[in-house]
Amino acid sequence: MKETLDEQSRAELVKYRINRADETIQESRLLANDCHYNAAINRLYYACFYAVQALLVKHGIFSATHAGVKTMLSLHFVSKGVIDVEYGKTFSRLFEIRHSGDYDDFVYCDKEMTDEYTPKAEAFISKIKELLD
């Protein structure tokens, strides 16, 4: 369905996804402040995921899976030098942590991890916003 969106609909979807990224970063901060670190890291991942989706949609690139979104980011933006490799690593690591937290047992994120990845996620989303302008 998304593949057939007209230009205006794609622009609206891009805006919606970036707004979701901003909202989700805020959710992550609230969760971290209440010491819900697994949930905070989960929300950091989703904030980045929504931002990446916005970037892909803007360029007419669509994927139905989380792994596909990660692959498309790497293929179309990281490997071409449009997005720094470190941003790609941040997104990949958050993907792994989120996946483990959702599907594996005895996975615990902590304050240090949240404190490390929050500014990385914020910088990553800021970079994507620059590319969307």
Residues covered by each model-derived region:
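Terminal alpha-helical segments
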Residues: 1-133
